[in-house]
């Protein structure tokens, strides 16, 4: 059995006890976000019990990431040696891929301790049936999942969408009704000055709400008088009107919406920008905000939706896998949260996908929330600095940790190993262990360690040289990705081929 709180505490304890201070925020002035992947393993003869949560299981953090930053287009490199996206969710996922590469090396060396067992095709492997993976993030993913209706009852703040107080709730992994919302925890954009005061203001019904300035990555905006709604923008008008109706349990109304700082994709539908609950259109693809220069990194909500169809292993490892490596659950820490928004962002947008290759499927991943707050979240730092006027800023560093024997820890800043000088950029010493070129080199070592007759067909059919070559040769993965883009994620921004031709 496991609960959302148990998974959250396991990740927080790993962060506290297994990682050094390097890369962590200075709690007097900095905050960060955390994400992790947890392996849940049941007894070998009790396959499936880890999902049902009915028996004792072994839980282990196998990958962890922190970070809030993202580089702009002008800092991207064609050599694959910079981290474009250092949001915690992406760092954790790339750290997980490093772990999977190590586990595949163990499998191809026929070591029983690997999480993989032989598949039915030559050179192919599959995950042991008694193992699942759970993704944890300390804050709601940026983008569509962070567009959350704010509901209130008279003179009460911080209520969840279904009318229950936050305090004291605990969620079992098998629960499907997990709609919690923390107080006013919002992720800021890089320009955010945390000295902005959060004000309590009275509304027409005599209740109170909070308001903050508009440069946050996740913000609250509040309902304006009815009218002046653009029904042609997207379906948000109908959805928000429905959300604004009073519920039977507590007569909750949508009085505002948490905003996301992620920007809509150029050429796609755009937000109305109407003050109040109509500000955002929901269900859109979004790119992460950058400081000045626009980024090419899709929001974490969009990336989770992609991983929920294609798996977390990426194109390279798919050469060796019979089936993708999927997440069984996504758990969010204590923060503003909506089950409806998470369901929409991660699952619903891609549920209708058809004509996927064998083994690929839109997963009904469990979406849960914990009541436990991350100690270095922006809200936690603010609560601990109530008497201080000091400005809070996002921590500039990102931490990657993988359950691998050699160099598990990796700390970066601005896309390179922390401490790298301008002169040192481009050297092997400047690279993160989870940048594209480093993961590619680990993959190449795996390929060369296997005799040709034991390689999968996709790696024996033709000469492959560049990162691009190997990715494109993963035919079933590319077919699935093409179907996903054409049917659901139409506006997805892909990196130009010139950024993928390194060796």
From Swiss-Prot:
Protein name per the record: tRNA-specific adenosine deaminase 1
The EC number(s) this enzyme carries: 3.5.4.34
GO molecular function, a single term: tRNA-specific adenosine-37 deaminase activity
Annotated family: Belongs to the ADAT1 family.
Residues the record lists as binding 1D-myo-inositol hexakisphosphate: 94, 303, 306, 436, 471
InterPro entries in UniProt: A_deamin
The reaction(s) this protein catalyses: adenosine(37) in tRNA(Ala) + H2O + H(+) = inosine(37) in tRNA(Ala) + NH4(+)
UniProt key word Secreted: no
Highest rank taxon of the organism: Eukaryota
Domain A to I editase positions: 63-502
Cofactor(s) for this UniProt protein: 1D-myo-inositol hexakisphosphate
Cofactor note: Binds 1 myo-inositol hexakisphosphate (IP6) per subunit.
Function: Specifically deaminates adenosine-37 to inosine in tRNA-Ala.
GO BP terms, alphabetized: tRNA processing
Active-site feature positions: 89 (proton donor)
Pfam families: A_deamin (PF02137)
Key words of the record: Hydrolase, Metal-binding, tRNA processing, Zinc
Binding of Zn(2+), residues: 87, 142, 300
UniProt source species: Gallus gallus
